[in-house]
C-alpha cells in the first residue's frame, strides 16, 4: 500500500494533479506482485473487469477474458485531458498488451469494441459487446407510472456536475417550467451544486446515495420509481449504468449522442440522443414534443422491453456463457 501511495504522489508531482496514475508499467508491476499464483493455478480462466494490463508482467498460463467499458485510446481528450506524452505512451502500450494477451475481449458498448479493433488491431472473431445491467434487486423492479399529468418528476444522476451536464439539466427544467410544464429536478449523486442553482424552487438535491447501504439503496429505488424521465446531458460517457436502471423502470431517457450511449438509448424506443451541440432549448423541445405527442407511454414500454432483452444481468450471464461456449471455454 505504501508503494502505491508513493507512486501516486510521485506521478502527481511529475505530471500534475490531473495525471492518471493507474496506467503505467510501475503501477501494473506493483499490482502483479500481489497476484497469488497458487490460487490462479486452481482456475480454468482469468476474468479481468478492467486491469488486464498486468498480464504484461504475469504469465497466467490461462485464457484471459478482458471486460471493460472503454480503451485507453478513446479516453484521451475525452475523459482525460492534458496527459503528458509519457503517460499516453505508457497507457497505449499496456492497453495493446492487455488486448493482445486476452483470449477474449468484451466491451460494454459498440463504441468501445470498435476501438479494440481499430486502435489496437484486436482479434475481430473474439471481440464482443455485452451491455451493463441494472444494479437493482429483481424484487424492486416495479415499473414507474408513465407520466400523464401533474408535476413532471425529472431524474438527474451523476457525481460529476460538469461532465454529466448538470447546468444544462437545470436550465432545461427551468425552461420547461417557463413554458408552463410543471417540472421538478431530482439530483442524485451530489450533495452540493453551484449555489445559484441549489436555491431554485424546482431543484431537489438528494445527495450521494451508496447502493451498498440498505437505507440509501431504498431511497434511490424510491426516487427512480417516482420519476417520469431521466435527463442526463452528459458530454462524455462510456456506459452509464443509470441508463439500464432507468429503462428497468420504464423512464424515457434524454441524453447526448456520445461515447457508448448508443447501446443503451435508442432514439424513439426508450428515449432520445441529442447532438453534443444541443443545449437546454433543444432538450426542452425534445421533452415537450414527446409529452405533446403522448409518446411517453411508448418510450416507457420501449425501455422496459430493452431492459428485458439485454440491459439486465441475467441476460448478460446467458450471453457470456454463450461466448464462452463458442470459444470452447
Region roles according to the model:
Residues 295-310:
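A short, well-ordered alpha-helix in the C-terminal region of glycosyltransferases
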Residues 72, 84-105:
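Membrane-proximal helix-turn-helix segments that form the acceptor-binding/catalytic region
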Residues 96-126, 134:
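A short, active-site helix/loop in glycosyltransferases that binds the activated sugar's phosphate group
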Residues 138-164, 169-175, 185-188:
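Conserved donor-binding/catalytic core segment of Leloir-type glycosyltransferases
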Residues 235:
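Aromatic "clamp/platform" in nucleotide-sugar-dependent glycosyltransferases that forms part
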Residues 194-229:
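Nucleotide-activated donor-binding/catalytic signature segment of Leloir-type glycosyltransferases, i.e.
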Amino acid at each position: 500500500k505504501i508503494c502505491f501511495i508513493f507512486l501516486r504522489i510521485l506521478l502527481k508531482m511529475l505530471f500534475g494533479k490531473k495525471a492518471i496514475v493507474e496506467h503505467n508499467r510501475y503501477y501494473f508491476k506493483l499490482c502483479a506482485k500481489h497476484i497469488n499464483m497458487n490460487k490462479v493455478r486452481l482456475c480454468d480462466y482469468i476474468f479481468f473487469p478492467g486491469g488486464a494490463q498486468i498480464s504484461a508482467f504475469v504469465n497466467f498460463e490461462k485464457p484471459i477474458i478482458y471486460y471493460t467499458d472503454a480503451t485507453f485510446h478513446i479516453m484521451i481528450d475525452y475523459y482525460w485531458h492534458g496527459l503528458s506524452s509519457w503517460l499516453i505512451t505508457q497507457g497505449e502500450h499496456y492497453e495493446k498488451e492487455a488486448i493482445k494477451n486476452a483470449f477474449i475481449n468484451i466491451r460494454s458498448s459498440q463504441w468501445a469494441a470498435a476501438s479494440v479493433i481499430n486502435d489496437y488491431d484486436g482479434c475481430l472473431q473474439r471481440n464482443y459487446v455485452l451491455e451493463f445491467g441494472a444494479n437493482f434487486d429483481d424484487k424492486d423492479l416495479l415499473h414507474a407510472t408513465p407520466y400523464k399529468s401533474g408535476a413532471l418528476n425529472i431524474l438527474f444522476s451523476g457525481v460529476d456536475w460538469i461532465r454529466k451536464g448538470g447546468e444544462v439539466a437545470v436550465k432545461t427544467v427551468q425552461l420547461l417550467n417557463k413554458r408552463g410544464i410543471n417540472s421538478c429536478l431530482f439530483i442524485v449523486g451530489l450533495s452540493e451544486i453551484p449555489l445559484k442553482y441549489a436555491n431554485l424552487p424546482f431543484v431537489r438535491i438528494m445527495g450521494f446515495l451508496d447502493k451498498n447501504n440498505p437505507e440509501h439503496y431504498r431511497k434511490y429505488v424510491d426516487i427512480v420509481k417516482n420519476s417520469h424521465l431521466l435527463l442526463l446531458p452528459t458530454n462524455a460517457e462510456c456506459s452509464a449504468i443509470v441508463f439500464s436502471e432507468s429503462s428497468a423502470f420504464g423512464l424515457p431517457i434524454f441524453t447526448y449522442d456520445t461515447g457508448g450511449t448508443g447501446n443503451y438509448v435508442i432514439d424513439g424506443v426508450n428515449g432520445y440522443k441529442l447532438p453534443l451541440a444541443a443545449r437546454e432549448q433543444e432538450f426542452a423541445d425534445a421533452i415537450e414534443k414527446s409529452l405533446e405527442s403522448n409518446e411517453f407511454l411508448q418510450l416507457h414500454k420501449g425501455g422496459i422491453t430493452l431492459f428485458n432483452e439485454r440491459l439486465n444481468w441475467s441476460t448478460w450471464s446467458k450471453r457470456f456463457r454463450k461466448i464462452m461456449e463458442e470459444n470452447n471455454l
